[in-house]
């Protein structure tokens, strides 16, 4: 369709399947172009008008092709075929209402202050597999993006500032699935699940001016009936007549996958019902996995206003703890890491922490399946397990090196320290209560060592499943050893020591007397190797 010097105005365009309409005419600026049908509208001229898309593809070939774009139903797609082909306001002139639609960057970078998406029906992707597209979200106050991000995209949330802008919080409660990086500078990023919306009753009384003609107010009856049943079955959250609440148990799980998350002077948190996979590289940043705070958009599902071309959001935050998962490796400098209640962290990538303290709260579990080094200590109120490195597509394991310069500090009776599966651990252990310390596992459970590392494993592990080097100061704790060797290099004290098929080897400095004090000792097929000065014996 071609035209010069005139505008088109009509009910809209319905394009059939596998059909393409090349649009080289102008649509009337005082009307809204409606596009339906599964076919493609290829827009070749800047329109100066708005468009609403219910189905099919719309290709944008000019800068600012439309003033505003509206997508609904989830069946429409906008494809960028030129840089800056969207608008230049904070929403880039595109609005995703109920069930949204897809924005395909198609190899073009795109910047938003906020993405006007009302639910997880919105997807931003890049179908160009050869050219990475940068999706920049630069909000400077709290904002929740409910949609999905996938394809060949690099996501950035960078604030141009000398100082960290803690209010510049980007909250993702949809999903991310990319093999590329995520980058955050001078700002905050949260990944979490999404509180499921519930139907609610009207909050006002029924309108009936002639009372004697009014029937039963069934809304009130239903509310009272629902409330009584929910009290009976301990599901009171269903009777609060709120679309969402922090104490409700039904949250959708958000899944977030990326290559590496780069943090510079930034805050990153994983809150309830989030499953995050990827590596983290942090500098002067704070990482919280299992954050006790969560966020709710009180207008979720109803964010799009003003006839489809505006966006509103009201965010609440409160305590709301749920299970979180993180899988990857962490490299951090001059940062801090906190692992919160109900967090499960699997460090399957190498972890190097320089001047970066880490704490593991009660109820949290950390499994280090790769080497871990820290120049600080590790505070443990939950559970830390250190292991060897499982080889992909194989049952063999490479020994894992774990080192804490300031040692491992166990607090409370629920603290649990475990080293097994070809782990070599160095660092003193301190426990202030009846903690549990487990070294090694039965020989029948010990995995096969990778053939390329047999000699190295023998040097590290002395033929045992696990090797530990350091002193243990834990007068109330229990230490269990099974197929393990303990190189005891300084004064140690333990409430209970149980050894099976193991060795305790005193390796203190020459000329220094090393003492192991144990209140209760159980030995099964084990050895204690003590050095002696035979010339003076």
Each language-model region and where it sits:
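Long intrinsically disordered, low-complexity regions that are acidic and Ser/Thr-rich
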Residues: 200-251, 294-313
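Glycine- and acidic-residue-biased ligand/ion/polar-headgroup-sensing regions
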Residues: 39, 53-59, 74-76, 168, ...
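Acidic, glycine-rich calcium-binding repeat modules characteristic of RTX/beta-roll
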Residues: 49-61, 67-77, 92, 496-498
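Extracellular, surface-exposed repeat architectures
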Residues: 1-45, 82-175, 250-258, 267-330, ...
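Strand-loop-strand
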Residues: 522-537
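A short acidic/small-residue loop/turn micro-motif
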Residues: 48-50, 65-68, 86, 179, ...
């Amino acid at each position: 369709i071609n035209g010069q010097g005139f505008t088109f105005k009509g009910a809209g365009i319905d394009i059939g399947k596998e059909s393409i309409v090349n649009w080289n005419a102008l649509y009337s600026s005082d009307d809204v172009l409606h596009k339906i049908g599964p076919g493609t509208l290829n827009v070749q001229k800047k329109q100066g008008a708005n468009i609403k898309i219910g189905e099919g593809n719309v290709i944008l070939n000019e800068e600012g092709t439309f003033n505003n774009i509206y997508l609904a139903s989830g069946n429409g797609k906008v494809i960028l075929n030129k840089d800056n082909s969207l608008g230049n306001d904070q929403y880039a002139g595109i609005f995703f209402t109920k069930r949204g639609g897809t924005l395909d960057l198609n190899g073009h970078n795109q910047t938003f202050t906020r993405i006007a998406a009302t639910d997880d029906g919105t997807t931003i992707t890049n179908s160009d597999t050869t050219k990475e597209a940068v999706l920049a979200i630069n909000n400077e106050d709290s904002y929740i993006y409910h949609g999905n991000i996938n394809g060949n995209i690099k996501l950035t949330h960078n604030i141009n500032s000398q100082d960290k802008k803690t209010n510049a919080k980007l909250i993702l409660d949809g999903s991310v699935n990319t093999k590329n990086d995520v980058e955050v500078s001078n700002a905050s990023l949260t990944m979490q699940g999404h509180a499921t919306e519930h139907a609610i009753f009207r909050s006002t009384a029924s309108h009936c001016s002639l009372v004697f003609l009014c029937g039963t107010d069934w809304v009130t009856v239903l509310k009272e009936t629902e409330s009584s049943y929910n009290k009976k079955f301990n599901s009171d959250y269903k009777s609060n007549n709120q679309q969402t609440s922090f104490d409700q148990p039904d949250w959708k799980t958000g899944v977030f996958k990326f290559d590496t998350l780069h943090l510079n002077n930034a805050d990153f948190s994983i809150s309830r019902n989030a499953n995050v996979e990827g590596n983290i590289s942090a500098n002067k940043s704070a990482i919280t996995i299992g954050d006790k705070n969560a966020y709710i958009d009180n207008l979720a599902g109803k964010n799009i206003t003003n006839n489809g071309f505006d966006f509103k959001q009201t965010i609440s935050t409160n305590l709301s703890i749920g299970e979180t998962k993180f899988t990857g490796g962490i490299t951090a400098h001059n940062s801090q890491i906190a692992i919160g209640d109900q967090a499960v962290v699997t460090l399957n990538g190498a972890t190097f922490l320089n001047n970066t303290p880490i704490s593991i709260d009660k109820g949290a579990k950390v499994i280090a399946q790769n080497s871990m080094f820290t120049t600080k200590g590790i505070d443990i109120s939950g559970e830390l397990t250190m292991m060897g490195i499982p080889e992909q597509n194989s049952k063999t394991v490479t020994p894992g090196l774990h080192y804490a310069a300031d040692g491992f500090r166990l607090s409370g009776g629920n603290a649990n320290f475990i080293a097994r599966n070809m782990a070599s651990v160095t660092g003193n252990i301190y426990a202030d209560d009846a903690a549990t310390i487990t070294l090694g596992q039965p020989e029948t459970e010990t995995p096969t060592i990778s053939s390329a590392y047999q000699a190295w494993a023998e040097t590290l592990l002395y033929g045992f499943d696990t090797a530990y080097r350091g002193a243990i100061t834990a007068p109330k704790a229990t230490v269990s050893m099974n197929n393990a060797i303990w190189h005891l290099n300084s004064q140690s004290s333990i409430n209970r020591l149980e050894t099976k098929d193991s060795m305790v080897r005193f390796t203190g400095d020459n000329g220094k007397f090393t003492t192991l004090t144990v209140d209760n000792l159980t030995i099964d097929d084990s050895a204690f190797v003590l050095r002696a000065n035979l010339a003076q014996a």
